[in-house]
UniProtKB/Swiss-Prot annotation:
This is Intercellular adhesion molecule 5. ICAM proteins are ligands for the leukocyte adhesion protein LFA-1 (integrin alpha-L/beta-2). Pfam families: ICAM1_3_5_D2, ICAM_N, Ig_3. Glycans are attached at N54, N74, N137, N195, N214, N303, N316, N371, N397, N583, N646, N764, N795, N796. The chain crosses the membrane at residues 836-856. It is found in: Membrane. It is a single-pass type I membrane protein. It comes from Homo sapiens. GO terms for cellular component: glutamatergic synapse; plasma membrane; postsynapse. One of its GO terms (biological process) is phagocytosis. One of its GO terms (molecular function) is integrin binding. Expressed on neurons in the most rostral segment of the mammalian brain, the telencephalon.
Amino acid sequence: MPGPSPGLRRALLGLWAALGLGLFGLSAVSQEPFWADLQPRVAFVERGGSLWLNCSTNCPRPERGGLETSLRRNGTQRGLRWLARQLVDIREPETQPVCFFRCARRTLQARGLIRTFQRPDRVELMPLPPWQPVGENFTLSCRVPGAGPRASLTLTLLRGAQELIRRSFAGEPPRARGAVLTATVLARREDHGANFSCRAELDLRPHGLGLFENSSAPRELRTFSLSPDAPRLAAPRLLEVGSERPVSCTLDGLFPASEARVYLALGDQNLSPDVTLEGDAFVATATATASAEQEGARQLVCNVTLGGENRETRENVTIYSFPAPLLTLSEPSVSEGQMVTVTCAAGAQALVTLEGVPAAVPGQPAQLQLNATENDDRRSFFCDATLDVDGETLIKNRSAELRVLYAPRLDDSDCPRSWTWPEGPEQTLRCEARGNPEPSVHCARSDGGAVLALGLLGPVTRALSGTYRCKAANDQGEAVKDVTLTVEYAPALDSVGCPERITWLEGTEASLSCVAHGVPPPDVICVRSGELGAVIEGLLRVAREHAGTYRCEATNPRGSAAKNVAVTVEYGPRFEEPSCPSNWTWVEGSGRLFSCEVDGKPQPSVKCVGSGGATEGVLLPLAPPDPSPRAPRIPRVLAPGIYVCNATNRHGSVAKTVVVSAESPPEMDESTCPSHQTWLEGAEASALACAARGRPSPGVRCSREGIPWPEQQRVSREDAGTYHCVATNAHGTDSRTVTVGVEYRPVVAELAASPPGGVRPGGNFTLTCRAEAWPPAQISWRAPPGALNIGLSSNNSTLSVAGAMGSHGGEYECAATNAHGRHARRITVRVAGPWLWVAVGGAAGGAALLAAGAGLAFYVQSTACKKGEYNVQEAESSGEAVCLNGAGGGAGGAAGAEGGPEAAGGAAESPAEGEVFAIQLTSA
């Protein structure tokens, strides 16, 4: 047996829940009222579906119970206080089943509500019109039969994916089923080809079910627009049998033009047109061909159909038959003098005209007779035929040519007696004769020579010139004529008749003549270049101004030729003062040579040779007339004197005397203007020792920074510096830079002690000596006797003592010495302190040490000081770091108790006879 259905399981679950609640209620409150319950109270069931209903009560022992409904039952299950029943094939839109129980002589009831729903399985969009005019309304109608409930239904009309209208049916009665939605829509161009559809939505989500959707099949809308105007026909009004003429039909304002159908016919003949679309217009073209069966009045029809509507145009076309006239000659070719008959005939309705003369009546032929002459050869005869068709006059014509046979004729127009051709270009030589048949023409020289190639393209040469006999012949006879051929050509100037170069001699008679070749004979004119209108004619007395270039031009009708003729006039040598001066000055180093240019043609050769004195037989170098890479070497020295210059060419010679002098530009060097000069301060100053060589004698000026050197002054240190000296004469300048140094005697500018206060025993002090001198001075010191452990700086400018003792007190002298003198200054150093008694107590020991120091000092003075240097370490260990004078120095023991270093007596010049030795310290 199959298990219970899901609905039954839900009903049983509800029943057990109700029983449990009932038992709990009985145990908790025995006085609670009894009730009946129906589950589910409200249910939505798809139409035709089934449902389990559970009916239960809390009555402990109900007497009886049941479920009242009009729906079909399929099965029932019972318990003490419950009843479950399955309802099937539920189709009613809405039913209310009743659950009841009898308990304690009371009837307990519970009512339920069962509603059915039907999916929108059928969604129908009513058919659209086959064609819908643009700008007019059409109806969209959508039906959804049976779907419901209607209150949960929504219908939407769509154009493609675009919603046009959407409607819901909320508020409709619960039992209402099915729906219809209708809308009026304006047809537009863009709706053509659009798909319209309807979408139905049954929304049961508020009732715990889903959303059911369905759409109709799409329906395509076709819109159209057709102009109210009739088509335009373009066709001939008349159409000849057997002819083809184009016809066309045009209509604007069509949409869609591609859907239009065009019918084009002539009578009952369909023309099957070719249709061309141009936007909202079309052009239908076809070719109409008329046949004899269609002769008469016919209609040309153009019919346009679109969207079930049509537009039509009709026009009348007359089809006619009009053959061309017939023109005949009795003889198409006759001999001169024979009679010829010309006849023109046409159809029965046509009127013919022959050579402008009409026939008497339509349908009758026209005739003409003539006696054939030469002038009638190739004569054309014209026949016209006219026919009236539908009020219009039609014309056709025909022509025929008559040939007349006659003997040849050579006319001057076709074969001139005199021919003149230009030489060179290719020509077609023509001598034509009239005659029928066409005559043959032959031209040859009378002497049996050259033959002219008539009718052929060929070059024209001078050899063709001459007289020719031309003969024309055909089967009717012959003709003879003599012709003369002249070949013309442009002038030519050759070297024989007109040489390129002509030489004349000054003072003789000559003429300038040029002979040119050409046909016709050319005229020759010679004009000097650059002189308009100066034509050279006849004999000339040759002068130099006749030399130059002449333009000779030969001219005839065939052209011109021109040639330049260079005329040279030669003459003997002649000196001119500007080009060969009588006096010349040579400047040494200028690189110039004597220029002696001589006038003459051809160019004379020139040689200058010394005459007398030191220049006897000496050849004077000359500058070449034209610069050349192989110019003569320029001499470094040129002997001045008198030279004789001779100029010679083939027309003579001439001599001239030249006086040559020599000069030179300024020159300064180390010997005449030393680059370094030294002055002594205070001396009388004179000009700088600068001189220059040169001719004429140069002047020399010296300046510093543009300021000239004063004539007289005393030399001071400010005069030291750099001077610029310039030497000048007529041939140039030379300059040198001179450095002036000013030397002066030494002066001890500063002698100072540090510290400036008192020096206590055991303390340190330093003496500084600064001297001004040039060249730099040598510094020397003189210290008190017995002063030990004295240190000097490398240049002796500083004297220092570490651990001063009483022996360091006394007078110190600083002396500065250079080549120009000596200068000295003195300073007194005092050493004192509270331990003076110690010094007194050790006086005896000091005396002994002093004696030993004096001996050592004498040794140092006699050895190291006289050499000018000694070792610093040795000097310090010996206790003597200074050089003493010959007397052994001054006393150094008298230092005051409160004293300190001080200058004693300021600067004092050392006696000339005193000897002070300089001390140079060197590293050990």
